[in-house]
Amino acid sequence: MGPILVLLVLLSLLEAGSANYDPCLDFDPENCTLTFAPDTSRICGVLIKCGWECRSVEITHNNKTWNNTLSTTWEPGVPQWYTVSVRGPDGSIRISNNTFIFSKMCDLAMFMSKQYSLWPPSKDNIVTFSIAYCLCACLLTALLCVCIHLLVTTRIKNANNKEKMP
């Protein structure tokens, strides 16, 4: 009885330790994703996402600070670096200054948008996108209805065939 009790106590201690595991210990502050989109003809929208598994991540860019996700803008003259800081369980802070080529990515996003006539938004674009969206939604709905119809008819056929077999 005694060894079993000791074993149970040890297992409960190990379980409590794994439940208190801090994902911020393994978090890499340089592993962030950046998304770019044209905001105006000169300003570029930037979305920086870092570590959803770690709540104590702070992202700072151009005097804006936010947890895990920061939506900001970039224009010529704004710094091309952002800071990611992670607070450890002991209170220590790891800081990483990440430099990124905002100017090149924003130029590329603007070029692609203008290349395919997606920027600047116009009444014609909005109408075209709305029509395309409605047509795709109708097509997907029709496809779903056909699939459900085929599923029901084949099940009924298979059920009738099984009943007729001796």
From Swiss-Prot:
Cysteine pairings via disulfide bonds: C32-C50, C44-C106
Glycosylation sites per record: N31, N63, N67, N97
InterPro entries assigned to the protein according to its UniProt record, in alphabetical order: Adenovirus_Gp19K (IPR006965), Adenovirus_Gp19K_sf (IPR038710)
Gene Ontology molecular-function annotations: D-mannose binding
Lineage top rank: taxon: Viruses
Gene3D superfamilies attached to this UniProt entry: 2.60.40.3530
Protein name in UniProt: Early E3 18.5 kDa glycoprotein
Gene source species: Human adenovirus B serotype 11 (strain BC34) (HAdV-11)
